[in-house]
């Protein structure tokens, strides 16, 4: 069923609101993908707080107009699913991980920090560890010298007790 003018304006406003707070937009071609697979992708996207939607390209172009994602409009051709996220890597990671297991989902382009990326750029962005992973690695690196020092002190205390006995 075709959308009337008010419905189209509502869709553009909704997507424009998502794009306004987004850091990353990823476009992927979904030609021939099964409904069950698309449902799985949407569930994974929801878990990662990624706005995932199939849109008419004309409406998507209107939504990104005047934003840092405007140069991405040139890539908006064919049947596309749009992944939009506030997290810098979440949309790229969700779409890239799913495209590895489903060859019908093909990453077409993406945009981050006002720059348009090709498929390789989106895959590179997806390979970056998440913020939580980076923080845990940093904590481990900071904690290692302290725990080593504590073990050395414990060994020294044991040695002193052994000498005293």
Swiss-Prot record:
Membrane-traversing stretches: none
Signal sequence region: none
A GO biological process held by the record: translation
Highest rank taxon of the organism: Bacteria
GO MF assignments: large ribosomal subunit rRNA binding
One Pfam entry name: Ribosomal_L10
rRNA-binding is among the record's keywords: yes
One cellular component term from this protein's GO annotations in UniProt: ribonucleoprotein complex
Keyword tags: Ribonucleoprotein, Ribosomal protein, RNA-binding, rRNA-binding
Protein role: Forms part of the ribosomal stalk, playing a central role in the interaction of the ribosome with GTP-bound translation factors.
Subunit structure: Part of the ribosomal stalk of the 50S ribosomal subunit. The N-terminus interacts with L11 and the large rRNA to form the base of the stalk. The C-terminus forms an elongated spine to which L12 dimers bind in a sequential fashion forming a multimeric L10(L12)X complex.
Protein family according to the UniProt entry: Belongs to the universal ribosomal protein uL10 family.
Name recorded for this polypeptide: Large ribosomal subunit protein uL10
Source species of the chain: Burkholderia thailandensis (strain ATCC 700388 / DSM 13276 / CCUG 48851 / CIP 106301 / E264)
